Amino acid sequence: MITEELKKLYIAHTGHEPEQIDELPSSGSNRRYFRLIGSPTLIGVSGESVEENRAFLYMAEHFRQKGLPVPQVFIRSEDDIYYLQEDLGDSLLFNAIEKGRKTSVFGEEEKQLLRKTIRLLPAVQFAGADGMDFSYCYPQAEFNSRSILWDLNYFKYCFLKATGMDFQEDRLEDDFQKMADVLLRSSSATFMYRDFQSRNVMIKDNEPWLIDFQGGRKGPVYYDVASFLWQAKANYPDSLRQELLKEYIDALRKYQPVDEAYFYAQLRHFVLFRTMQVLGAYGFRGYFEKKPHFIQSVPFAIENLRQLLQEPYPEYPYLCRILRELTELKQFTDDLQKRRLVVKVTSFAYKKGIPEDSTGNGGGFVFDCRAVNNPGKYAVSYTHLRAHETEADLV
């Protein structure tokens, strides 16, 4: 049924049938994507929500008129359930930075793609908002108290309660309201992409292109920065995150003055909020819909939460207490231990025999260090040093 409808659109647009139609993998949404191979090759989309489809179709045309890199939509069905758009290829930014994500060591090419992407964001937020009719946005036209509390309760019901934790709902709701008040201090008329992260950026000709922006609305600039730089599985080291923040602020100054102290102070509240929002999504898509990608992302988001809570949020005392307890649950601490690489360095004397392999796998490395003097034989004393100290590297 879906492929037949997409084929009709393809024929109406090109005058001939596609050579082949292949369904593409989907992730979090209920939209289905197909590649219609032919001359030209196009992407066909089938979406169950007409309102969401219309939001995308309107925004795609609006952004193209503003010169932003988004796929062109060529034809749509009369009921707006199906449409054909430009094929941007298969290269997601998420995949392009795979080596860095897995090692936390990002090469220069990966960093350059990230710089280009984060510097593009202010253009989306400001130029994208210029002349936009926000009434097309779905399900909300703007970032407001109602949408904030929706997301916080999404976290509460789809993730927090799913862990079996006990908590006082009235005290938690009090802190939710405080958070909404803090986040709304930063109201603005800019476009908030809402899900600006490396899975929603494609790389074509070494340049970033934007997809999946149909959930966008009017809102503050901080949310998208938090979404991108604190994406759970992106695994950006803090040094790279700070570098990209500077790139963003530099690009932002083209559109408005920036008080950096206020910017950073406000951003950390959005980072906490976004982390809770994605945990809610991971809970629903992973625990309830059983989608493996979302289940696999939970430990990374929990680790983000651990790092965030190292600095206090005095505005939300009860919420932070519950979040700390959440990060200490056995199911998350056990998973953290599984993901940590443990390297043990020991020494032994051959005259006592080869030591027992405690791992049971027979692996490892043995280095013959008999020609190396013991540090204790040097005139300079090294007894005050420990392995984590820089000077100890010289031994």
Language model region names:
Residues 383-390:
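Conserved small/polar residues in nucleotide/adenosyl-binding loops
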Residues 280-336:
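ATP/Mg2+ or Mg2+-diphosphate-binding catalytic cores
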Residues 54, 93-116, 133-193, 204, ...:
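ATP-dependent phospho-/nucleotidyl transfer catalytic cores
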Residues 1-14:
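Juxta-kinase regulatory segment immediately upstream of eukaryotic protein kinase catalytic domains
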Residues 153-162, 221-257, 272-288, 301-308:
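Active-site activation/catalytic loop segments of kinase-like enzymes and analogous catalytic loops
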Residues 30-36, 124, 179-223, 235:
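Active-site acidic catalytic loop and adjacent metal/ATP-binding pocket
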Residues 37-142, 148-149:
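ATP-binding pocket architecture of kinase catalytic cores
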Residues 339-381:
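Glycine-rich, flexible N-terminal cofactor/catalytic loop recognition
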